[in-house]
Amino acid sequence: MKKQILYLIVLQQLFLCSAYAQQKKSGNIPYRVNVQADSAKQKAIIDNKWVAVGINKPYALQYDDKLRFNGKPSYRFELKAEDNSLEGYAAGETKGRTELSYSYATTNDFKKFPPSVYQNAQKLKTVYHYGKGICEQGSSRSYTFSVYIPSSFPDNATTIFAQWHGAPSRTLVATPEGEIKTLSIEEFLALYDRMIFKKNIAHDKVEKKDKDGKITYVAGKPNGWKVEQGGYPTLAFGFSKGYFYIKANSDRQWLTDKADRNNANPENSEVMKPYSSEYKTSTIAYKMPFAQFPKDCWITFDVAIDWTKYGKEANTILKPGKLDVMMTYTKNKKPQKAHIVNQQEILIGRNDDDGYYFKFGIYRVGNSTVPVTYNLSGYSETAR
């Protein structure tokens, strides 16, 4: 009997130690995934729901066991001044990224297909379309996440800490004659074999030999073909021009015009006053002076979205969207709750076949190199 009791005690201790080890996480998160072009290996999947994207430096993304949320380690993100590694929206600009993506695919998602399906998805940059995390076009969903902004955070930083993106397909193209059409996968692959794509612009593929006779290919002149590539986030929470802001973007054009950079400025735009071009609308749904934004505490955002419904090739809006945002936190040991966006009708989304996916972290834009550090945690999403 004593042996049985001792055995049960040992088992209990092992279970408790295992549970504690699962809760106690700290240090660098080392793996990165290009969700558009690669599947995620098991070791790269974080807490069974994320993969990391962006710059891979030891400090860029870490578990933070000292700053916990609901008893679990949070995610600490950091970009230093020299960490902008991407081309910016405008010529000559740069931007930086260290984020967690809720959408990704694994090899299991391709098991029922022949190998060519994955190989083609890599070329199409649609690997993540086969996996998890993308909601349906025109659907309704609820999202929750929490952010911790330290009082040391610079008031001149320009960063997006949470964003929703569309999931476009490169099979939607414009021909050199200006015809907009959707290619079959085989038709797109025929273009892929003889062209190099830089963002949405196709260039002739030019053969080049090095001194050893090895053949490589470089981009020649633009040849008039354009492919769908996406655009601004459909919804973004961030800081810019001395403000915390929430911005919704809409693009009703079937093939996005990348030259149209219609984009509301948090500093100058009025709240809920849309800023529009022919096809695009950008709206500051909420803004708050940065000095008033709560620091050194966890802030939870509960977000309800009815995504706008679009008319595909007709370039029309069938039904506007709706946005609702609650902001809760604790100040001086007292719970605070603010209904900062109250069931507002709004244009929000993209005219694509597929819907949207969530990312949070640091997305430093506007050519900013101001160092930034903050923590995020507590994400969930549900269909409504």
Curated annotation (Swiss-Prot):
Single GO term (MF): heparin lyase activity
Residue positions, PTM Blocked amino end (Gln): Q22
Entry comment on modification after translation: The N-terminus is blocked.
Compartment annotation: Periplasm
Keyword Signal recorded: yes
Catalytic activity, as annotated: Eliminative cleavage of polysaccharides containing (1->4)-linked D-glucuronate or L-iduronate residues and (1->4)-alpha-linked 2-sulfoamino-2-deoxy-6-sulfo-D-glucose residues to give oligosaccharides with terminal 4-deoxy-alpha-D-gluc-4-enuronosyl groups at their non-reducing ends
Glycan-bearing residues: S39
Signal sequence extent: 1-21
This enzyme's EC code(s): 4.2.2.7
Record keywords: Glycoprotein, Heparin-binding, Lyase, Periplasm, Signal
Organism superkingdom: Bacteria
Pfam families, sorted: Polysacc_lyase
Enzyme class: lyase
Induction (UniProt): By heparin.
GO cellular component, one term: periplasmic space
Keyword Glycoprotein attributed: yes
InterPro entries in the cross-refs: Polysacc_lyase (IPR025975)
Quaternary data: Monomer.
Role, per record: Degrades heparin and heparan sulfate. Also implicated in the release of heparin-bound growth factors from the extracellular matrix.
UniProt name for this protein: Heparin lyase I
Organism of provenance: Pedobacter heparinus (Flavobacterium heparinum)
